[in-house]
């Protein structure tokens, strides 16, 4: 099989359009979007009194710190943060406030428009002029409407961070120029050493190189551009360089290509136009390796041929010349193919190795037949060889183009699969976010249920305490009622003889109050039964809480409990009002009873006094009688009566005719 080299430099790439014309004839939707974003940010700045455009450089700084930590390590990221911080402090301390805000806002908006795909064009320049005019004419003077102390560090960062990035860019540019200079120096040294090596070659090979030069000059009748492009792009050396490059130069170039390949692989996803760059670098590396192998084989063949010539002393001078000529002629196409970047087939390699190493007469005859003297090499033969090489190179170009098309199809398929994977990743992320939101909502609902249950437990404890307090009050009221009933019974028994109809109303009132008290006790029993039922329901709810099988059942039970507790609170408030009314009625009845008892006691005292006075008077003057008009007590009968004897505490005898003092 014949190995072919791909012509990497002639890969078809899309032509770069001029950015200015593309910006002029581009769509206006992008610039309308810029204007809308700018207007919205200015409106937010005016409403919230904060400059939100200063947050964009801060976000860029965070991204650059993350990238530096990811690709260059912790030390470089810390160094970068320190440098940016010192730059921000310098800008904060040494730049005036108005100029600081003006420069920061202007830089942010100009940089925002600069980062578009259009580049420098008429709409972007007009937008820059508009932004600078608004910042200089309106916002440069009105700093009172903003939080200056809060916005000032961000404004300093908007100026300090670009200064740091420009410094790093300048440093990379200087290092790149120094590297190019070093490469040129190494290239000059390699060329010098190559010239020394060429001068150290035998004169016969120098004559062969001169003949090759003449053949190349004769081939200039063909199209110069095609031959030069083919020779140059196939990895060969131009005509002024006689042989291939040395090993150190090839290794240096391979290292540089590997570095470029790593950098291109790192930036592969930035632009779709740069997708084929790693493929080009790989093909170029293969070309350099093939050139290196060809140069090695060429040198080995030359050394082997010279050794064979020195060993064969028995041959004549003509045979030596023929052998040298055959070695040179056989090596010249090889060197030519090496300069063109192609590698000979395995069969040709084996034949040449056998010709250089074998000493058999058959091999010697083949060499003598294939060799041609130097003076017999004519220019038309060189032209024929060049045409054959051109045909081979065209075939190689077609093969490389086919390989390029296959690679592009693979890249397109890989890009489509990557897009599908990205869309799937986006869907999976959305599903993950939805699941996380559902979990968060479920956790929140669980916490709310726990809080509601704890609140209900607190309310139940408060209700139980209120219930115990009410029961204590009821017991005290019952005791008070019993004491009041006992005192009332005593008062009624004491005043039953003297008072007939005045206490009937009070007795009826007491009976009514007793009936109301019985009703209240019945109501209290009913309420106690309800409270017991509620306690049972609370126990059931606690069981539901321990199980936590269904939150909806808990919520419905909690709502029912809330309604019932509200109803109980309302009923308890009504009961307390009724009790207060009953207590007020009892107090009024007690007052009336006390007043009536006081009146009865006063009347009894008056009756006793009158009885004593009457007994004394009747004892002193028994013959005196009173008429009906003067007697307020008994108008028909006399003042003396047997009724007074029963109740009189006096020791006088009312039946005595004459007053006699008592004998001791």
UniProtKB/Swiss-Prot annotation:
The modification Phosphoserine is found at residues 305, 332, 631, 634. Residues 320-348 have a biased composition (Polar residues). GO terms for molecular function: microtubule binding. The keyword Acyltransferase does not apply. The keyword Transmembrane applies. Residues 253-265 have a biased composition (Basic and acidic residues). InterPro entries: Macoilin. Residues 253-274, 320-367, 630-664 are annotated as: Disordered. It comes from the Eukaryota. Keywords: Endoplasmic reticulum, Glycoprotein, Membrane, Nucleus, Phosphoprotein, Transmembrane, Transmembrane helix. It is found in: Rough endoplasmic reticulum membrane; Nucleus membrane. Glycans are attached at residues 324, 340, 452, 655. One of its GO terms (biological process) is neuronal signal transduction. One of its GO terms (cellular component) is axon. It is a multi-pass membrane protein. The chain crosses the membrane at residues 28-48, 75-95, 120-140, 154-174. Plays a role in the regulation of neuronal activity. Belongs to the macoilin family. This is Macoilin. It comes from Sus scrofa.
């Amino acid at each position: 099989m014949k190995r072919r080299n791909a012509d990497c430099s002639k890969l078809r790439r899309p032509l770069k359009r001029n950015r200015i014309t593309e910006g002029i004839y581009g769509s206006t939707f992008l610039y309308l979007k810029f204007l809308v974003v700018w207007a919205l940010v200015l409106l937010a700045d005016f409403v919230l009194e904060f400059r939100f455009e200063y947050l964009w450089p801060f976000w860029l700084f965070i991204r650059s710190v993350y990238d530096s930590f990811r690709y260059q390590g912790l030390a470089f990221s810390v160094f970068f943060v320190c440098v940016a911080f010192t730059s921000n402090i310098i800008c904060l301390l040494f730049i005036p406030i108005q100029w600081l805000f003006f420069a920061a806002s202007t830089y942010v908006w100009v940089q925002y428009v600069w980062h578009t795909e259009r580049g420098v064009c008429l709409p972007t320049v007009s937008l820059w002029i508009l932004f600078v005019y608004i910042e200089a004419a309106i916002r440069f003077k009105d700093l009172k409407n903003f939080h200056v102390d809060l916005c000032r560090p961000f404004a300093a960062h908007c100026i300090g961070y670009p200064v740091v990035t420009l410094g790093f860019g300048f440093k990379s540019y200087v290092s790149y120029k120094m590297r190019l200079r070093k490469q040129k120096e190494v290239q000059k040294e390699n060329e010098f050493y190559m010239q020394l090596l060429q001068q150290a070659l035998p004169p016969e090979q120098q004559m062969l190189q001169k003949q090759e030069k003449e053949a190349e000059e004769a081939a200039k009748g063909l199209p110069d551009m095609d031959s030069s492009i083919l020779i140059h792009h196939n990895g060969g050396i131009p005509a002024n360089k006689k042989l291939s490059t040395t090993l150190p130069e090839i290794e240096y170039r391979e290292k540089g290509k590997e570095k470029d390949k790593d950098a291109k692989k790192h930036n592969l996803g930035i632009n779709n136009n740069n997708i084929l760059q790693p493929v080009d670098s790989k093909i170029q590396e293969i070309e350099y390796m093939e050139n290196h192998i060809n140069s090695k084989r060429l040198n080995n063949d030359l050394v082997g041929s010279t050794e064979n010539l020195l060993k064969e002393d028995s041959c004549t001078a003509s045979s030596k010349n023929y052998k040298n000529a055959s070695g040179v002629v056989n090596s010249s196409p090889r060197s030519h193919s090496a300069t063109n970047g192609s590698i000979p087939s395995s069969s040709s390699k084996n034949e040449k190795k056998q010709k250089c190493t074998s000493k058999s007469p058959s091999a010697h005859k083949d060499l003598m037949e294939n060799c041609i003297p130097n003076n017999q090499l004519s220019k038309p033969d060189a032209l024929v060889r060049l045409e054959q090489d051109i045909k081979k190179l065209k075939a190689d170009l077609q093969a490389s183009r086919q390989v390029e098309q296959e690679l592009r199809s693979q890249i397109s398929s890989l890009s489509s699969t990557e897009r599908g994977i990205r869309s799937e990743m986006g869907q999976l992320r959305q599903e993950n976010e939805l699941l996380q939101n559902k979990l968060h909502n479920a956790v929140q609902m669980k916490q709310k249920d726990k809080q509601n249950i704890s609140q209900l437990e607190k309310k139940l404890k408060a209700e139980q305490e209120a219930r115990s307090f009410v029961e204590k009050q009821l017991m005290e009221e019952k005791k008070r009622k019993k004491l009041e009933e006992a005192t009332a019974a005593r008062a009624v028994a004491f005043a039953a003889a003297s008072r007939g109809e005045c206490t009937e109303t009070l007795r009826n009132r007491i009976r009514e109050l007793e009936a109301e008290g019985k009703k209240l006790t019945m109501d209290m029993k009913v309420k106690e039964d309800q409270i017991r039922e509620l306690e049972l329901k609370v126990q059931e709810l606690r069981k539901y809480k321990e199980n936590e099988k269904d939150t909806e059942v808990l919520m419905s039970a909690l709502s029912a409990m809330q309604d019932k507790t509200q109803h109980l609170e309302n009923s308890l408030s009504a009961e307390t009002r009724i009790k207060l009314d009953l207590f007020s009625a009892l107090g009024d009845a007690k007052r009336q009873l006390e007043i009536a008892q006081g009146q009865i006691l006063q009347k009894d005292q008056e009756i006793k006094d009158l009885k004593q006075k009457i007994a004394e008077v009747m004892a002193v003057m028994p013959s005196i009688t009173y008429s009906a008009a003067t007697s307020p007590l008994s108008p028909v009968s006399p003042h003396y009566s047997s009724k007074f004897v029963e109740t009189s505490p006096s020791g006088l005898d009312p039946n005595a005719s004459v007053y006699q003092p008592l004998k001791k």
